[in-house]
């Protein structure tokens, strides 16, 4: 099958781009021919600016050559932020609607879709695009939330988030700790991902501060989109980590190998998100064999595995951290 993929792509520092690369590699391994349409800062086969819907028009123009067109959808990938970009947003939505109408083989993998704002023309057009496309989601709860937000019934298929995750780094906990120069026996908790308020890493720091015992909490991540909210949040997190004994913030982009090494080295990966649809970090942890402490938001509850722990409050998060610091081991890290 000949497949076009529309997505951000490495070397851009973007989790969805990394996901798209892994999923494209899987498709190629299955014998499909894959052509990636990426922004200029990605290593796609075709590179166009993701502005004003140009990526969708390019896919539509080339569409006759493909049996399937897969669009990786997350608003931040395709829409310029801010009120001054209103016309650009309309053009982007028009581009996507034109693509799905002209090329019915288009599939939209929805990583995230912000709640619909009915008064905005770009959202009206976007809703029409979704209505004509075949949609994919990672969890049933994401699909249901999408239907509530957009007030529409749409058939959809679910895809395992792990299909877009490839790990080839260190999986053994002891080896990962040696690689990172860490104490082999000290309790280690890790938060990993982009620094933004919805990740809730500040919740983990406060819960760690409220617990007792040996151990470290390491936050590994960087700001992906330099919005004022994200920049302010990173600054606050920096101050909070510096003021909390046992907490380290390793700010900056990390290679897949080092990212996976930190996850493998951890006794628990902590995902204290305040808003999420699904989590690539959780999928990576599951493939690496690291249990996670996961907030009950969005589709995460549906994504958790048998060794993961779901928390529904800050106090439950504190108690989960306390158990690890007290030496209690649950699951495969015994």
Please report, for each region that a protein language model flagged, where it lies by residue:
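Acidic donor-binding loop of glycosyltransferase active sites
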Residues: 261-277, 290
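Donor nucleotide-sugar binding/catalytic pocket of nucleotide-sugar-dependent glycosyltransferases
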Residues: 130-171
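Conserved acidic donor-binding segment of nucleotide-sugar-dependent glycosyltransferases
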Residues: 306-316, 323-328
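A short helix/loop element that forms part of the nucleotide-sugar donor recognition site in Leloir-type
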Residues: 169-182, 235
């Amino acid at each position: 099958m000949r497949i076009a993929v529309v997505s951000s792509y490495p070397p851009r520092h973007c989790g969805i781009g990394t996901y798209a690369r892994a999923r494209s590699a899987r498709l190629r391994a299955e014998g499909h021919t894959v052509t990636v349409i990426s922004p200029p800062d990605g290593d796609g086969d075709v590179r166009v600016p993701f502005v004003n819907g140009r990526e969708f028009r390019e896919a539509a123009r080339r569409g006759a050559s493909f049996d399937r067109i897969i669009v990786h959808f997350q608003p931040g990938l395709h829409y310029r932020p801010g009120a001054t970009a209103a016309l650009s947003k309309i053009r982007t939505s028009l581009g996507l609607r034109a693509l799905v109408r002209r090329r019915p083989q288009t599939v939209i993998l929805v990583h995230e879709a912000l709640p619909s704002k009915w008064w905005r023309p770009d959202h009206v057009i976007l809703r029409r695009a979704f209505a004509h496309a075949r949609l994919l989601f990672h969890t049933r709860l994401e699909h249901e939330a999408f239907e509530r937000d957009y007030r529409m019934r749409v058939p959809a298929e679910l895809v395992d988030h792990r299909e877009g995750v490839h790990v080839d780094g260190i999986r053994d906990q002891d080896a990962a700790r040696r690689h990172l120069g860490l104490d082999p026996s000290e309790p280690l908790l890790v938060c990993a991902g982009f620094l933004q308020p919805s990740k809730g890493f500040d919740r983990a720091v406060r819960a760690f501060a409220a617990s007792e015992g040996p151990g470290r909490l390491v936050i590994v991540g960087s700001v992906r989109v330099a919005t004022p909210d994200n920049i302010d949040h990173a600054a606050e997190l920096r101050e909070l980590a510096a003021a909390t004994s046992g907490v380290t913030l390793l700010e900056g982009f990390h290679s897949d190998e080092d990212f996976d090494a930190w996850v493998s080295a951890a006794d628990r990966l902590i995902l204290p998100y305040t808003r999420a649809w699904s989590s690539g970090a959780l999928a990576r942890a599951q493939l690496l064999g690291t249990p996670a402490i996961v907030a009950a938001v969005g589709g995460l509850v549906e994504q958790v595995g048998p060794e993961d722990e779901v928390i529904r409050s800050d106090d439950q998060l504190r108690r989960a951290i306390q158990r690890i610091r007290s030496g209690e081991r649950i699951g495969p890290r015994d």
